[in-house]
Amino acid sequence: MCATDWLCYLMQAEPDVDTLISEIVPDLEDLVYDGAIRLDQVYDVMMEVISCAAARPWWVSLRLISVARYQWDILGPELLARGADPNTQSLAAWLDVLLVTILGAMDPKKTTMFLMQLEAVPDVVKDPGKDAFDEMEMDTGAFLSLGG
């Protein structure tokens, strides 16, 4: 799958993991109904699939995508100028260019804090009862405050 295939699900205001799962595993309902897999296991596996496709932890990926969505008017043209093409690149490669673009546009004094926030392990990893998407987004104010 190219980056576009992933981003059409993950770059929405609320990432559409349910539809992504059904696209990747079309027989999922049958597997859950037959008891071959539990629904909570499906989401855990899907987060790992996102991690593999992105070559970084899923929470870092979702936060990067969130920053791109909020700041698309700034980052979109920069990504194009850097040759980032989500139609031909993997999700991992596209996210690499996105991260370099974000860091390049940021005040160097603020990169450490940005990276700490980006890579912070979410509570849902520590406490599986929490909703994974509640704490994944980095709001516009947080991003802009890091830019200088």
Language-model-detected regions and their locations in the chain:
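Charged interaction scaffolds used for protein-protein
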Residues: 2-19, 23-148
